[in-house]
From Swiss-Prot:
Pfam families: BATS (PF06968), Radical_SAM (PF04055)
Pathway in which this enzyme or protein is active: Cofactor biosynthesis; biotin biosynthesis; biotin from 7,8-diaminononanoate: step 2/2
Gene3D superfamilies: Aldolase class I (3.20.20.70)
Note on cofactor: Binds 1 [4Fe-4S] cluster. The cluster is coordinated with 3 cysteines and an exchangeable S-adenosyl-L-methionine. Binds 1 [2Fe-2S] cluster. The cluster is coordinated with 3 cysteines and 1 arginine.
UniProt name for this protein: Biotin synthase
PROSITE patterns the UniProt entry points to: RADICAL_SAM
Keyword Iron carried by entry: yes
Top class in the EC scheme: transferase
Binding-site list for [2Fe-2S] cluster: 100, 131, 191, 263
Native source species: Shewanella pealeana (strain ATCC 700345 / ANG-SQ1)
GO BP annotations, alphabetical order: biotin biosynthetic process
Catalysed reaction, written as an equation: (4R,5S)-dethiobiotin + (sulfur carrier)-SH + 2 reduced [2Fe-2S]-[ferredoxin] + 2 S-adenosyl-L-methionine = (sulfur carrier)-H + biotin + 2 5'-deoxyadenosine + 2 L-methionine + 2 oxidized [2Fe-2S]-[ferredoxin]
Classification via InterPro entries: Aldolase_TIM, BATS_dom, Biotin_synth/BioAB, Biotin_synthase, Elp3/MiaA/NifB-like_rSAM, rSAM
Residues given in the record as [4Fe-4S] cluster binding sites: 56, 60, 63
Amino acid sequence: MPEVQLRNNWKREEIEALFALPMNDLLFQAHSIHRQEFDPNEVQVSRLLSIKTGACPEDCKYCPQSARYDTGLEKERLLAMETVLTEARSAKAAGASRFCMGAAWRNPKERDMPYLKTMVEEVKALGMETCMTLGMLSAEQANTLADAGLDYYNHNLDTSPEYYGDVITTRTYQSRLDTLTNVRASGMKVCSGGIVGMGEKATDRAGLIQQLANLEQHPDSVPINMLVKVEGTPFEKLDDLDPLEFVRTIAVARITMPKSRVRLSAGRENMSDELQAMCFFAGANSIFYGCKLLTTPNPEENDDMSLFKRLGLHPEQGIAATKEQDEAMLAKAAAHQDKKSAAFYDAGAL
């Protein structure tokens, strides 16, 4: 097979034509590219932690963390450092190579940036890759996180530009693109994808992929989420998307962004093992690991490892911590046993 050429000039009709291929042809093309660019049996494993939950001012119609919807979600302040590090250690012990931290904000406040910078540094010291999703970032904020060593920043486009206004009205599509520009300019890696099953048309799924694939540099990681319908959100009663359309979206993402990690994100809890196996064959090679994604359910770790074993898959190996980092981590954990720390961070203490 000839070497895959990266493109940033995809036309909508080209991507729609990929979606329209017979399933066998689409899967063959996607898997061939996947096998050429990656170990087809390796899956990168990330753990996602909500470091600040609920009370978000945005009106994203899919999101239980919006303050505008009554979903029964209890809001929480920014987590204390030791709480985050305990979760990160647990994630590493369970086999995760990347630790992702998410906050329900429109954008981070300047008063919190020093604390977030320290959080990145502390998690990095455990020998893990780091990722954050905090909302919109200014160029200065992106540089601060990059200086701390943050590896990835997630900011999804969610859907096509045409359908976007039916999903969100409190932030523009361009503002999302601007944040991605700031992240890339800072030197961090970009994690950006979207959500399917929000009532969009097939052309909107093609439009989402087109926007991602036509970025000046493809996202390093492309999370594809299946809508998790949460009671109290405007999208709670939408019809289910045909699961095969989800597989098609994974396959087209793989074809158009051949060197990117394509992640199975939200919605896996409701997917059969057979559907997930098709997604891995179609080019997905990353998952979120653990029983919860921010506030929505996710398969248990043991279920994922059992599925990996049945499919002959293995997780990507994490970054090994140095001996000095291991000793520092153990010393900090031992010291923590002698004092009880608060569960939440107090910004006023800075």
